[in-house]
Amino acid sequence: MRFFRFLVFPVIAGLSSVLAAPITSNDTVDGSGEAPETLLQNSEEQPHQRLKFYNWDYKDLGTTAFEDISFPARQPPVAVNQSEQCPDGWLRFADSCYWIETELMGFAKAERKCFEKQSTLFVANSLEEWDSIRSHSKEAYFSWIGLVRFTHYEKSEQLPRWQTEGAINPTKMNWLIKPYKPIVNGWTSFANCAASYKSPATLESASYTFFYPCTYLLYSICERNSTIVNVMQ
């Protein structure tokens, strides 16, 4: 029954504007007894406009979640290559390192936290990478990834955009409703940001991707690789 609630609620959300992440009143966050309403709170953090290497132009997003803010000073980036290990606590896949963030944050703060680690939100360059990394995310919860759909392109462009170039076609991902269409997968003018849900069930099809308001407090995944490091310097 618990699995059924996780699977059905987002469908309703996609058809009737936007609801909260599909967690019921009987669930708690991370077993700590924290009320699930925490996930429905709006984060006061606001995404930045200062990282020019991002493909995103936040002025094209029809939401106050994307406004200019002051940004912390950049730290010297750390290169990643095949012969080196990832920092403690990071996962390794090919030439990238990944951080599974278990602090609940709005999209903006998640993006900033990744940047402070000389990384971006997770951008999948292959389906193998996508399946491998999201399998390490926290079960029964959503994690922000580096994927948004701009309001400005609502009529001319169906696909969301990744935070960096060279990523997989988003339609190939495990969206809740297939074939991919933005509206039925939760997108509205104020639900621009994509999150990945990892089901506690062993059935792979129970995990999915869905759009939510960027101010929802979710977990997140950071990625650091040599390409990103070179651009950030």
Curated annotation (Swiss-Prot):
The keyword Signal applies. It comes from the Eukaryota. GO terms for cellular component: external side of plasma membrane. Pfam families: Lectin_C (PF00059). This is C-type lectin domain-containing protein 87. Residues 93-223 form the C-type lectin domain. It comes from Caenorhabditis briggsae. GO terms for molecular function: carbohydrate binding; pattern recognition receptor activity.
